[in-house]
Amino acid sequence: MTAAQRERAALVATMSEIGPDSPTLCEGWTTRDLAAHLVVRERRLDAAPGIAIPLLAGYTDKVQRRTAASTDWDELVDKISSGPPLLSPFKLFDAVANMDEMFIHHEDVRRAQPGWEPRSLDAETIAALRRPVGMMARLTMGKVPARVTLQTPEGETVAVVGSGPGLTVTGDIGELTLFVAGRDEARLTFSDAQAAQAVRAARRGL
């Protein structure tokens, strides 16, 4: 199994354990809503573009709500577990397109629960998450009012984005991934608390 496939399996296990009505970090979404989002993304090519294109978002939201309401919970989870259908572009590019998606949404489920702790990630998962961080950071934080350096606790610079006063954000790769994706529930240290607040307010979520 690839790192993306293992993360998918872990997400499915967590969703199965906590059920369809638990909160997530995605504002207004329960685990059922999040599961429907993942199913629509991979299986409804007519509706998936609205996830990224605001002009089409209304139709996507309608399809997602219908999917959440009309599909049995176990069926939703099974569809996530089985992965993209044969003709889906996500099937061909699963390792690239789904690693971050599965990790971020798994943590959206985990970290909405009280008492969460970061998971210990294996080397393959860390490497798979590390590759797209820079591209994601440019997408979500390119216009933040600070020159942000993302670095690991070992001092490795992962990405530098934005312009303005310097801000160093330090954390493990998984935590940096979540921060870049717009999540505040991440274990990080910031060199400047005021700049960090401004960056949080200005970044785009995924």
Where are these regions (language model features)?
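Structured surface interface patches that mediate subunit assembly and partner/cofactor docking
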Residues: 3, 18, 44-59, 75, ...
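Short, contiguous, pocket-lining structural segments
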Residues: 3-7, 26-30, 65-68, 93-97, ...
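Short, charged, amphipathic alpha-helices and their helix-cap/turn boundaries
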Residues: 4-13, 68-80
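C-terminal end-helix/capping segment
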Residues: 55-71
